Amino acid sequence: MTQKIVLYDTTLRDGTQAEDVNLSTPDKIKIALRLDEFGIDYIEGGWPGSNPVDVAFFKEIANYHLKYARIAAFGSTHHPDNKVEEDPNLNALIASGATAGTIFGKSCERHAKEALRLDPKRNLDIIRNSVAYLKRSMPEVYFDAEHFFDGYKRNAEYSLAVLRAAHEAGALIINLCDTNGGTLPNELQQIVSDLRVALPEVRLGIHTHNDCEMAVANTIVAVQAGAEMVQGTINGVGERCGNANLCSIIPVLQVKCGLACLPEPACLLYTSPSPRDYAAS
């Protein structure tokens, strides 16, 4: 049986961080409906509670019956000063009505210490508590391990502890993030391969950025090494140099690698221009 790769589109969230990309709620709805026709598995609609456009999107998209896609809401782990059940960010995800909640957390020990000013063990508790809290109220919870590859190269033991914490708390898939876009394909493939041995029970996904023009290549080799979920955007739109381009990745995985991605691959021909057109309007 052909392996199915889970496609997770973040055009409506990470893609909107690109320069001069401003999408209204109607724009987001139109793009989401096109992505659903395309056969995308998950559409990350935005960060609930962060701005009026995203709040309106989650309310409006609930009025549509989607054929293929499930809607995901994005957010962060709970604030260190908040009790998990009182954290407005997590409660906004739950209130969004989205099927899936995806939260990010620090997977680099240095960032936990210097950016969050937290004891690394406290960071693990925050990740564990945040995932477990969402899991009680949302059908599906995913965890984005921010700066994973940089963190792993500095302190592999700690980064592995982060993945274990998220998995044990109930995260269905953990997405390994090349947040700075600086990891080379050979080292990324080796790390993912090592994780398949160290954590065989953990389902992995991949989220790459294109600062070194490696986002597509890194995504492909991650899948070849065992990643099951691919995060990216249409046309690679995203902050700085962009995200992994799903319009390049999907044909490679489906045609060159023989993996199942889309129900109707020909849809790529008319889906690709959509976000670019709206972003420029």
Range-by-range predicted roles:
Residues P26-F38, E86-I103, S107-K113, K121, ...:
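Alpha/beta enzyme core
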Residues D41-H65, F74-T77, K106-R117, H147-D150, ...:
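Glycine-rich, proline-tolerant flexible connector loops at the mouths of alpha/beta enzymes
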Residues Y270-S281:
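Single conserved hydrophobic/aromatic residue that forms the stacking wall/gate
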Residues L12-P26, G75-K83, E114-D119, H147-A156, ...:
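Active-site mouth loops of central-metabolism enzymes
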Residues T2-H79, K83:
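N-terminal capping/small domains of soluble enzymes
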Residues V55-S76, D125-S137, I191-L204:
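Alpha-helix-loop-beta-strand connector modules within alpha/beta enzyme cores
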Residues M214-A225:
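Catalytic cores of alpha/beta
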Residues G15, L35, G101, F143, ...:
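Conserved, mostly hydrophobic/aromatic
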